[in-house]
UniProtKB/Swiss-Prot annotation:
Cofactor binding comment, as recorded: Binds 1 zinc ion per subunit.
Gene3D superfamilies per the UniProt record, alphabetical: Aspartate carbamoyltransferase regulatory subunit, C-terminal domain, Aspartate carbamoyltransferase regulatory subunit, N-terminal domain
Identification of the protein by name: Aspartate carbamoyltransferase regulatory chain
Gene label: pyrI
Residues that bind Zn(2+): 108, 113, 137, 140
Subunit record text: Contains catalytic and regulatory chains.
GO molecular function: metal ion binding
Protein source organism: Methanosphaera stadtmanae (strain ATCC 43021 / DSM 3091 / JCM 11832 / MCB-3)
Length: 153
């Protein structure tokens, strides 16, 4: 596809999340608490990709993601590319990378885990598998997969 064949129009300022696993963009919008009454969003679902076969793309006009949102995004779309757009120019392109350990982003799905008590303890998970994502709680060793993670957002 050439640049003249864009399926979704360019945005002036904001964020573009590209290379999302096909049919996962709605989970990301839910995590970002979008749509809302003020933010223009463009979503392409299950479009052709030379690298991935099929992918999703999200364009968010007038908003850049917070670090907290990026930390959650990497769990839902670890292979995604995050682009910051200003005055129609891509000023920063970041390839998301899932670290070997995740801290204070999600909660253990085990209701008896110490992290779900009133104790002031850090929520820590080892990344057992990056694709598909599997996390293991540092304290109780409960494993969590994509659906367990996504349901928290």
């Amino acid at each position: 596809m050439t640049k003249s064949e864009l399926k979704v129009k360019r945005i002036k300022n904001g964020t573009v999340i590209d290379h999302i696993t096909a049919n996962r963009s709605l989970n990301i919008l839910n995590m970002l608490k979008l749509p809302d009454d003020e933010t223009a969003i463009m979503v392409a679902i299950n479009v052709e990709s030379s690298d991935m076969g099929r992918k999703d793309i999200i364009k968010i006009e007038g908003r850049e993601l917070s670090q907290d949102e990026v930390d959650k995004l990497v769990l839902l779309a670890p292979q995604a590319t995050l682009n910051i757009i200003r005055d129609y120019q891509n000023i920063r392109k970041s390839h998301l990378h899932l670290m070997d350990e995740i801290t204070d982003v999600v909660t253990c799905s085990n209701p008896n885990c110490i992290t779900n008590s009133n104790e002031p303890i850090q929520k820590r998970f080892a990344v057992q598998n990056k694709q598909p994502i599997t996390l293991r709680c540092y304290y109780c060793e409960r494993t969590m997969e994509y659906d367990d993670i996504e349901s928290q957002f």
